Regions:
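Active-site/ligand-binding surface loops and adjacent short beta/alpha elements
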Residues: 139-195
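Acidic, serine/threonine-rich low-complexity disordered tracts
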Residues: 27-138, 180-284
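Bacterial N-terminal signal peptides that target proteins for export
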Residues: 1-11
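Bacterial N-terminal signal peptides
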Residues: 11-19
């Protein structure tokens, strides 16, 4: 069974992953999450959108912001096929750098029509741990992956992807464009993404509509989702990760929470720019 045990994530990396994708790892083949061409008028985001998620750690009386996750998206017209380019940056707050410094960079290029990835890279610096991933996605859905580790060793491998196998930056934008009107509470959706030299097969559950207050932004109508975390060095595998996205056409992540082995991690939307649609989910 494939698990995330031993995967060297930090609180900030987990907040980015947790925004959409952590769940139960399984061995058997799963049905694919539907991949479809999305009419431009229905796209949940636009070039120029910028989101900042504030990551926090809670344990007993300790409740502190530890860093930020920043995401922005632009368009590329330099290739024969129009693409989106999404970039992510994860950084610890200055005071936290003395304990454990994180400075991670992600970049993904994907089709503007169906949001399928063509290229992905990540450059990870977490304490003394560093790693780089470079992926090129092929027409047959396999992935040419190059993994470069701290000692300079290079691993080239071919990953057996499927049409619904994403990198987790592209997955973030793809999932915002699901056909939410067809969802019912309790519906479960398969998710597949690549990281390092592995493919992870996970599940996402829709839990229905809710309201949530986001510090500094207000109260919003939202859609609530959950996923079962995988037991390992950070999660205990006993409780669900939960997250809330805006119940409007933008589908932006508002709040994320998950128990960890010691304490709890959360991520809340801190700021946003250039949303495609009015944020009509805001109540007050």
């Amino acid at each position: 069974m494939t698990t995330l045990t031993g995967y060297k994530s930090t609180i900030l990396t987990l907040c980015l992953l947790s925004a959409w994708v952590l769940g139960h790892a399984q061995e058997n083949e799963k049905p694919c999450l539907p991949v479809r061409d999305i009419p431009p008028s229905q796209m949940a985001f636009q070039a120029g959108e910028k989101l900042t998620i504030i990551a926090s750690y809670q344990w007993g009386v300790v409740n502190t912001d530890v860093g930020t996750v920043s995401l922005d998206i632009s368009r590329s017209d330099s290739s024969d096929v129009p693409l989106f380019i999404a970039r992510g940056r994860i950084q610890t707050a200055r005071f936290f750098n003395a304990f454990f410094r994180v400075d991670d960079y992600y970049e993904s290029r994907f089709y503007r029509t169906n949001l399928r990835p063509t290229y992905f890279m990540r450059d990870i610096h977490e304490g003394k741990y560093t790693i780089q991933n470079y992926y090129n996605y092929n027409q047959d859905h396999t992935i040419n992956a190059r993994i470069i580790r701290k000692d300079g060793s290079v691993q080239d491998t071919l990953l057996p992807g499927r049409i619904c196998t994403f990198d987790f930056i592209t997955l973030f934008y793809f999932l915002r464009n699901l056909e939410f009107s067809n969802m019912n509470p309790g519906d479960v959706y398969p998710i597949s993404f690549a990281i390092d030299e592995e493919i992870f097969e996970l599940y996402l559950r829709y839990d229905g509509k809710d309201e949530i207050r986001v510090q500094g932004l207000g109260t919003f109508r939202c859609l609530k989702f959950s996923a079962q975390t995988v037991a390992g060095v950070v999660f205990d595998g006993k409780e669900d990760l939960r997250f809330w996205i805006s119940d409007d056409k933008n589908r932006v992540p508002l709040f994320i929470e998950s128990p960890v082995v010691v304490g709890r991690v959360t991520g809340r939307l801190g700021s946003y720019e250039n949303l495609r649609f009015p944020l009509t989910s805001k109540i007050k």
